[in-house]
Amino acid sequence: VVEPYIIRDDVPTGEGSNYHLSKDMNFIGLGGCGGGLSEKIAVKRRWVHPISDKIPLDQAALIEPLSVGHHAYVRSGAKEGDVALVGGAGPIGLLLAAVLKAKGIKVIITELSKARKDKAREAGVADYILDPSEVDVVEEVKKLTNGEGVDVAFECTSVNKVLDTMVEACRPTAKVVIVSIWSHPATINVHSVVMKELDVRGTIAYCNDHAETIKLVEEGKINLEPFITQRIKLDELISEGFERLIHNNESAVKIIVNPNL
């Protein structure tokens, strides 16, 4: 599995480093060095992580986004027995929830889309799924946590109302982790953050997460098969790949492009 970074040679990449935040960081396929649809690419040894035959290659393609979820989990400081609220069951939200479940954390997902709610149920990554169009999420969370609120909340939508819900659903001294990449300014209820002494944290990509992520899959703690929603030929890349993701992304989690089909 390739950790698809382009990092300057003088940047430390060992344990404890933050190479993912380094100057001029970029990604293979976006910033050069070939791309994932190339027949072959050359990758520096540092960015290649071995996998066993316990992980089929099509599922191995999901290690990269799963590592995003793992890094968000690490940033949260969540531990076994905690209760987490995941705001949004898109691809990253679902994979994050899978990591949390594998780590022994009780997961509550809030999601509007029926297709995404169904996928969360199918994948078994949530203990509870709440639809904000049907229930008051904060009130339901309080009922599920003996009136206390969750230990950690993950915002995965870039929607301000969801961020507001994450803040209000937290117990005092909880963590709010912002997972999504916002293209627009957001507001946050600073009064709630202060009065409950909440920690608000960002998370981006991954940093020394791949090895532990691979281990979770190889040990059978995460099954990636449910997250592959479609396999397409290379000549279907536009119509069944990009256009589906642009116009009908609620039905897609991860689409595998296989030139050999």
Task: Show the residue positions of the predicted features.
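Rossmann-fold NAD(P)-binding glycine/threonine-rich loop
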Residues: 180-197, 208-210, 215
